[in-house]
């Protein structure tokens, strides 16, 4: 299941044109023009899962969300779903962005805490939550930074998900 916030459904089109998945085999669903973590997105996810599980009994289902998806509504939904069980929650985090925009990742937690104290939400809230609620975290774009910088970024965000 692929989620793309855009109506263009770029991710869905790219994945649908592979040898591994296709809609005709009932092993692929794309949910576009909505956030899968929103109320309407959860309804679309529910429908997609029903369609997938009607004709198949897959060993696993991979759910690829938009980068702007909030993890907690998805975790709650999947935890309560009668036919599936959540085994892993993987977050991909852009190491270059953390390095450039958050001083090697060191400013992410203080800015997130500032939002919590003010009762506001910012992109830092979403980013911190995506790190906090995952059980697997991959730092991406590591090839663009020296190894020691990637290590420093990893150390800086580690308190969010020890």
Which residues does each PLM region occupy?
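Structured helix-beta-strand junction loops
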Residues: 133-134, 160
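G-domain G4 guanine-recognition motif of GTPases
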Residues: 64-66, 92-97, 134-150
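A short helix->loop->beta-strand "cap" motif at the edges of active sites that frequently abuts
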Residues: 87, 161-162
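Nucleotide-state-sensitive switch-loop elements of NTP-binding domains
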Residues: 1-120, 125
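GTPase G-domain guanine-specificity segment
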Residues: 14, 103, 141-161
């Amino acid at each position: 299941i692929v989620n793309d916030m855009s109506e263009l459904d770029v991710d869905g089109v790219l994945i649908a044109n592979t040898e591994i998945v296709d809609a005709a085999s009932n092993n692929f669903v794309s949910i576009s023009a909505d956030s899968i973590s929103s109320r309407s997105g959860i309804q679309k996810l529910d429908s997609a899962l029903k369609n997938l599980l009607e004709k198949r009994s897959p060993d696993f289902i991979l759910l690829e969300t938009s980068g702007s998806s909030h993890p907690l509504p998805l975790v709650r939904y999947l935890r309560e779903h009668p036919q599936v069980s959540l085994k892993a929650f993987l977050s991909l985090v852009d190491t270059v962005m953390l390095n450039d925009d958050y001083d090697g990742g060191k400013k992410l937690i203080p800015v997130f805490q500032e939002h919590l104290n003010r009762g506001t939400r910012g992109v830092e809230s979403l980013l911190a939550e995506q790190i906090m609620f995952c059980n697997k975290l991959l730092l991406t774009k590591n090839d663009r930074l020296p190894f020691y910088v990637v290590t420093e970024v990893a150390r800086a965000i580690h308190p969010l998900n020890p």
